[in-house]
Regions:
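Nudix hydrolase/Nudix homology domain
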Residues: 101-161
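Conserved N-terminal beta-strand and adjoining loop/helix that marks the start
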Residues: 1-20
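Short loop/turn microsegments at loop-to-beta-strand junctions
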Residues: 9-10, 46, 103
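A structural signal for short, well-ordered beta-strand segments
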Residues: 12, 68, 86-88
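Active-site-adjacent beta-strand/loop module that shapes the phosphate/pyrophosphate-binding cleft
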Residues: 73-95, 106, 110-112, 119, ...
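Short coil/loop residues immediately preceding or within conserved phosphate-binding loops
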Residues: 7-9, 31, 81
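A short coil-to-beta-strand element that immediately follows conserved catalytic motifs
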Residues: 62-70
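Conserved Nudix-box catalytic region and its N-terminal flanking loop in Nudix hydrolases
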Residues: 19-57, 152-161
Length: 161
């Protein structure tokens, strides 16, 4: 394989009591709009590690990736842009938002999702899917058998061929 330039982002799908964690952007082009806790992957960082870091930076909570809920992919200005939404399991830790990035955070039910001013239709769809569906791709961590971070995400059910 050959490396290519890539814009790689991640989002956390965190559920509590049948509600999903949403954040309102405090600044930038999406100021005042709602979405999932999200951010960019740093060089040399696994996307699954980045989502845990971003969740802690933005909302002050820690968690564990349990699987992938969805992926958004597009090409803009000749640059591939990939965005991975991970299910993240957390305990009932209190939220402690980073007010420089996030103006508000709250848990919302499926019935409430339509009332938000979303960052994008894709973000809305990822949140809705994450709230209504379990992770279709489960995580297997092979890092302990390799000399580097190594995760595989596979379907939970056997897929007939």
């Amino acid at each position: 394989m050959r490396p290519i330039p890539l814009d790689l982002g991640v989002a956390a799908i965190v559920l509590r009591d049948s509600k999903i964690l949403l954040v309102q952007e405090a600044q930038g082009p999406h100021e005042g709009q709602w979405g999932l806790p999200k951010g960019y992957v740093n060089p040399g960082e696994l996307p699954a590690s980045a989502v845990i870091r971003e969740l802690h930076e933005e909302c002050g909570i820690k968690g564990t990736v349990t699987g992938i809920c969805g992926v958004r992919e597009c090409v803009r200005n000749e640059l591939a842009r990939i965005f991975i939404a991970y299910h993240v399991q957390t305990s009932n830790q209190p939220l402690a938002i980073d007010v420089d990035e996030i103006s508000e955070a709250r848990f919302a039910s499926a019935d409430e999702l339509e009332q938000f001013n979303w960052i994008s239709p894709a973000m809305h769809d990822l949140a809705k899917s994450g709230l209504l569906n379990d992770s279709p791709l489960a995580k297997i961590d092979y890092s302990t058998t390799q000399s580097y971070p190594y995760l595989v995400h596979i379907a939970k059910e056997e897929i007939p061929i």
